Amino acid sequence: MISRVWILWTLVLFLLVTESHCIQKSSLSKNWGPQSMLYLKGKHGRRFVPDIDDHFISNSGLKSWYAVFK
């Protein structure tokens, strides 16, 4: 009975070590170039809420959702 438990734990340990090495090889870091960054930004560019500027809001006429989304 003790030998079966020892074999089982050895097998589990071996599988965990093997699996951990496989995961590290598959998660390679990528170097994002400028073209890739443009693709990731999408059609509308960066998405941020600008500082509150009354001149910007009054000239644009977009006081609702567009100002929030941009």
Curated annotation (Swiss-Prot):
Keywords from the UniProt entry: Hormone, Secreted, Signal
Predominant subcellular localization, coarse grouping: secreted
Bilayer-spanning residue ranges: none
Location within or outside the cell: Secreted
Prosegment residue ranges: 23-30, 45-70
Signal peptide: 1-22
GO cellular component, one term: extracellular region
GO molecular function: neuropeptide hormone activity
InterPro entries (UniProt xref): Spexin (IPR028126)
Similarity field: Belongs to the spexin family.
Protein name: Spexin prohormone 2
